[in-house]
């Protein structure tokens, strides 16, 4: 099973009122799409970007076992527009901000629970 995940997050005035959006496309015979949008309160753009990735992984971590889809062997392909988040998650940039470090750890835990 393959999932294509698009995430985005943003804050007005940075920091300011922030929200995240996620679209998860399940590539199979049904090609089901799931959309998640959520206000996350006051945050920076970078916090919102990380939160969107976390929300997508949390959804998949809960969805996969309930659907009988094995966690291991499932392909999850992410698309996001935050170079900072991509580079930090891939270990290319250091995570200096404490809040971003906390969010990155949450993302890494979810990845390991899914089998990534």
Region spans (language model):
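RNase H catalytic domain
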Residues: 10-14, 54-116
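RNase H-like nuclease fold core
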Residues: 1-47, 51, 58-62
């Amino acid at each position: 099973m393959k999932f294509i995940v698009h995430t985005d997050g943003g804050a007005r005035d940075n920091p300011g009122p922030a929200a995240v959006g996620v679209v998860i496309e399940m590539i199979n015979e049904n090609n089901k799409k799931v959309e998640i949008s959520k206000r996350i309160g006051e945050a920076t753009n970078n916090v919102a970007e990380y939160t969107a990735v976390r929300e997508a992984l949390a959804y998949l971590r809960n969805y996969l076992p309930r659907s009988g889809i094995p966690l291991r062997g499932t392909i999850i392909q992410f698309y996001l527009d935050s170079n900072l988040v991509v580079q930090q998650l891939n270990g290319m940039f250091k995570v200096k901000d404490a809040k971003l470090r906390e969010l990155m750890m949450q993302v890494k835990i979810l990845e390991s629970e899914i089998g990534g």
